[in-house]
């Protein structure tokens, strides 16, 4: 089955431009250097599946003309991946069923606490997002496609990436556990965290991510969760031909 993947956001948790920064990338005229918080949309068989609801989701949805949403998967509960949940409201109002949200138990509980007014039946506000939380305890089958959770390490925490068809999305990665590599064979497309060149305690560097690419051997790799240390055009010129920086608005066709 054919699918389309759209990069809604390719940036780090602070986004690019970063508030208060006067660096060349933050003031770059190249639109590829404008990076909202990290998220992707996968469309297939008339369905739309979102990975993470960033604080920039409203802007991302308007930019890409998103008209409907059928499910949301969460990688983990950090602010740059969940704070846009309330902005799914307009997409939830004209559906016969609530939009299902899928998260690890710890992240589902965090969502319930942070968005209590949505999930607590004692709150009687009108106009709430019509969503329903489900916990991830294994593969998630959505509209005929299996989304396989891939455990990755993010600093001291274990979080999720996802394998779907011949593609995988691994954002916020400092290392990949040995047991997860078996889920990454035969990929056409890999999205992989590559924050910058300088080491970081919770994110992979460009150099480390290139080592991962050499082991996994996907046909194409797109780095994501990119900070303002990496100018788009200049960085791409240093990468192997099958590896590129992703960018907001990038669209790819693939087999799911």
Regions found by a protein language model. Name each.
Residues 175-256:
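Cap/insert and terminal regions of metallo-dependent hydrolase folds
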Residues 1-170, 236-255:
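Binuclear metal-dependent hydrolase catalytic cores
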């Amino acid at each position: 089955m054919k699918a389309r993947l759209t990069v809604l956001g390719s940036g780090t948790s602070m986004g690019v431009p970063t508030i208060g920064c006067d660096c060349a990338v933050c003031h770059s005229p190249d639109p590829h250097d404008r990076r909202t918080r990290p998220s992707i949309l996968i469309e297939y068989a008339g369905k739309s599946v979102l990975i993470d609801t960033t604080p920039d989701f409203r802007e991302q949805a308007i930019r890409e003309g998103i008209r409907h949403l059928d499910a949301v998967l969460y990688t983990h509960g950090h602010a740059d991946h969940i704070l846009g949940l309330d902005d799914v409201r307009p997409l939830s109002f004209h559906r016969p069923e609530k939009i299902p949200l899928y998260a690890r138990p710890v992240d589902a509980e965090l969502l319930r606490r942070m968005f209590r007014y949505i999930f607590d039946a004692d709150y009687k506000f009108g106009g709430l997002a019509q969503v329903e939380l489900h916990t991830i305890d294994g593969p998630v089958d959505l509209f005929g496609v299996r989304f396989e959770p891939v455990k990755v390490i993010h600093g001291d925490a274990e979080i999720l990436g996802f394998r779907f068809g011949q593609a995988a999305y691994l954002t916020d990665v400092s290392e990949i556990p040995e047991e997860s590599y078996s889920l990454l064979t035969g990929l056409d497309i890999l999205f992989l965290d590559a924050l910058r060149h300088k080491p970081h305690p919770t994110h992979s560097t460009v150099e480390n991510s290139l080592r991962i690419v050499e082991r996994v051997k996907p046909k194409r790799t797109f780095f994501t969760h990119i900070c303002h240390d990496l100018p788009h055009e200049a960085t791409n010129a240093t990468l192997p031909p099958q590896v590129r920086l992703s960018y907001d608005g990038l669209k790819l066709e693939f087999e799911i």
